Design a protein with these regions (language model features):
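Catalytic beta/alpha-barrel core
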Residues: 1-14, 21-37, 43-49, 53-56, ...
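Glycine-centered helix-coil hinge/cap
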Residues: 18, 62-64, 111
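Catalytic cores of alpha/beta
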Residues: 12-13, 29-43, 72-79, 83-101, ...
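Glycine-rich phosphate-binding active-site loops on the catalytic face of alpha/beta enzymes
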Residues: 5-13, 46-58, 92-122
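Extended, intrinsically disordered, low-complexity segments
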Residues: 125-132
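Substrate-recognition "cap/lid" segment bordering the active-site pocket of phosphatases
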Residues: 56-62, 67
Length: 132
């Protein structure tokens, strides 16, 4: 279950759905929103949009802000927004636990399966670079 800032609180979602569901919270690029989500026992947090995107009418976040507080994060984090085959590897210094993709998956000229395969190869490359 993924919650935006205008949705129910994480603690409310946990009460309704119990422990059988993971609950994540969008934090834009705010360490304060991250701390609030952590206090409410979020299972993960999401930061974004990492790049300009057609899915959200929001300006992209400053990834340098995430870099500054990344070492303090105790929850897994997702980068979301505008991530595509061309810009994915530029996120390697952030080492996100997960990425969320929409448009670059569904709108890929070769179709979503080919896009997913390409992402899988890029993610292997990203993981290998981070393990070095």
């Amino acid at each position: 279950i993924h919650l935006g800032q205008n949705d129910k609180s994480c603690s409310e979602a946990k009460k309704v759905f119990g422990k059988n569901f993971l609950v994540g919270v969008s934090c834009s690029n705010s360490y304060d929103l991250y701390k609030k989500a952590k206090e409410e026992s979020a299972d993960y947090v999401a930061f974004g949009p990492a790049f300009n995107t057609d899915s959200k009418n929001k300006e992209k976040i400053d990834l340098n802000i995430i870099r500054k507080f990344k070492s303090k994060l105790k929850l897994p984090f997702v980068l979301i927004g505008g991530i595509n085959h061309k810009n994915l590897l530029s996120l390697k210094s952030l080492s996100p636990n997960y990425i969320a993709i929409i448009n670059s998956l569904w709108n890929f000229k070769g179709g979503p399966i080919e896009s997913a395969k390409k992402f899988r190869e890029l993610l292997k490359e990203l993981k290998n670079e981070n393990d070095s």
